[in-house]
Amino acid sequence: MLSILLSLLSLSGTHAAPISKDNGTVCYALNSSTTDESIFPLLNGQGPHYDYPQSFGIPVEVPDQCTVEHVQMLARHGERYPTASKGKLMIALWDKLKEFQGQYNGPMEVFNDYEFFVSNTKYFDQLTNSTDVDPSNPYAGAKTAQHLGKYIAYNYGDLFSDSNPVFTSSSGRVHQTAKYVVSSLEEELDIQLDLQIIQENETSGANSLTPADSCMTYNGDLGDEYFENATLPYLTDIKNRWMKKNSNLNLTLEHDDIELLVDWCAFETNVKGSSAVCDLFERNDLVAYSYYANVNNFYRRGAGNPMSNPIGSVLVNASYNLLTQADELDNKVWLSFSHDTDIQQFISALGLIDNGVTEYSLDQVDFQNIQQLSWVTPMGGRIFTEKLKCGNASYVRYIINDVIIPVPGCTSGPGFSCPIEDFDDYITNRLNGIDYVSSCEVQQVSNTTELTFYWDYNEVEYNGPVSNK
């Protein structure tokens, strides 16, 4: 139990690294870092994990008169390297930056004697772990996953049964994250869990943790298209500031290069624990970047994309069915692992952060209205759905990255939870008129029209294969 309690420090913004193992108990020492963790929420979910930044002040502890009788989790993989496609762009930009033999001045002097942070391209797409990054790095994806396992064990350990299923998509980094969490849970609870690998491909149809794969009408480029003819002044300001001290260099920096360097800052922090590239940017630069990135997210995966709610409804409907059938089901814990895209579409369909705004300004930062989808899905992001038993009544509440996010218009229960009868009405209204199969024209690629793996995993063999991405 001591090891679990100590590891919780890492899940509330303080990171810890194992230093010894005595009598089976792992002890943790706080790992100091020069990294400014306050910028993590501004990096569009590409940097290390952080708590959800907007808290209503609601205690995350279970209300005194209640117990948790059923819990679900939908989690993103832990911290990773850039994808192969983004990594190639970074290498091309690095080639452009390093071809100059002179000295950079001003903010760009970080590139004097700089060494590219990915030592081998084979690491692209992969989870960061102690075999390929400095073990003292507090933000390694493997560490985040191990700590998450301890967090789950501490909060929900008494709900587990032996051979409890855990569900992961077949992506390599997602599967590896799930394995680290499972290993941590098995060690803490002395049980054996049953890992189910749900295939990521378009033929899976609705029986998937990644239902966007089978949505033939989904346009994932809608966010980029919204920006197609836009000029973002903040990028011009950054470029002018950098080049003012380097006017002698024959260097052409495009706006895409500047945005890519924010990504660079995030991913290098995942890999090395810190990044000098982050020092290129002033805080206001990152505030503007975060705003425009979340506008892109809104149209790419959020309520601004007409297919987000149909896609997200697959997992919302499955979650709701698990809740309503909780008394009859053998398992009380349902853990699932997927990607940020799928979680953002789930949140969009669920409506937890939907403020009703349908269009955003590209001329200036619209602080009052932006939906911060990236706050839901940092690396290692997770959403817990709890069903509480309080006396003779049941209630539902959501915990996003360790912060209670109330169900809109449904907060009359203990700890601002939602009475189950009112929750039924809320979900019915959210899903009314939404049909994933017809909206997505799923039957072009698959005849599978329902999600069944939560119910038939004992009869159907869900075992991958696992991809390298």
Swiss-Prot record:
GO terms for molecular function: acid phosphatase activity. The keyword Transferase does not apply. It is found in: Secreted. Induction: Repressed by inorganic phosphate. The keyword Amino-acid biosynthesis does not apply. Glycosylated during secretion across the membrane. Its main location: secreted. It is an enzyme of class 3 (hydrolase). The active site is at H77 (nucleophile), D340 (proton donor). Glycans are attached at N23, N31, N129, N201, N229, N250, N317, N392, N447. Its EC number is 3.1.3.2. Residues 1-16 form the signal peptide. It comes from the Eukaryota. It catalyses: a phosphate monoester + H2O = an alcohol + phosphate. GO terms for cellular component: extracellular region; fungal-type cell wall. Keywords: Glycoprotein, Hydrolase, Secreted, Signal. InterPro entries: Acid_Pase_AS, His_Pase_clade-2, His_PPase_superfam, Histidine_acid_Pase_euk. Gene3D superfamilies: Phosphoglycerate mutase-like. Belongs to the histidine acid phosphatase family. This is Repressible acid phosphatase. It comes from Kluyveromyces lactis (strain ATCC 8585 / CBS 2359 / DSM 70799 / NBRC 1267 / NRRL Y-1140 / WM37) (Yeast). The gene is PHO5.
